[in-house]
Amino acid sequence: MRNPIWFMLVLGFCLVRASASFAAEHQTDAEPSPELSLQGKAFYNQFCRNCHGISMVNAGTSSFDLRKFPHDDRARFINSVMNGKNSMPPWGDILKPDEIEAIWAYVRTGGKT
């Protein structure tokens, strides 16, 4: 390359962008607001309760026990809801992103909202 300073600036910019993107993707979520958790409870009762149960567990079924879902794994939760997993159907065409976020907020409370 003819201009090593230009190359270093571009490389530095790319590294900063990549690290910021990685940090944003892997950050631990702050505690959800009570309002968002209450909205999530309503969506949970409408869309999730039949399979996952009133208390986030449905004994005697193959449904995942949501009480045990890692509270720091938002990306996994969003992916599972959007695309489905095992016997869970995908909800990405039915639920809006803000509704999924609200359900995630409720799940993080362990059903204590």
Could you describe each region identified by the protein language model?
Residues M1-M8:
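Bacterial N-terminal signal peptides that target proteins for export
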Residues M8-R17:
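Bacterial N-terminal signal peptides
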Residues G12, D29, S55, L66, ...:
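Generic anion/oxyanion-binding catalytic loop in active/binding sites
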Residues S21-F43:
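Electrostatic cytochrome c docking/interface patches
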Residues P34-K41, G53-M82:
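Gly/Gly-Pro-rich "capping" loops immediately C-terminal to redox-active cysteine motifs
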Residues N45-Q46, N83:
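Charged, alpha-helical scaffolding/interaction elements associated with membrane systems
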Residues C48-C51:
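Short cysteine clusters
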Residues A59-R67, M82-T113:
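Axial heme c-ligation environment in periplasmic c-type cytochrome domains
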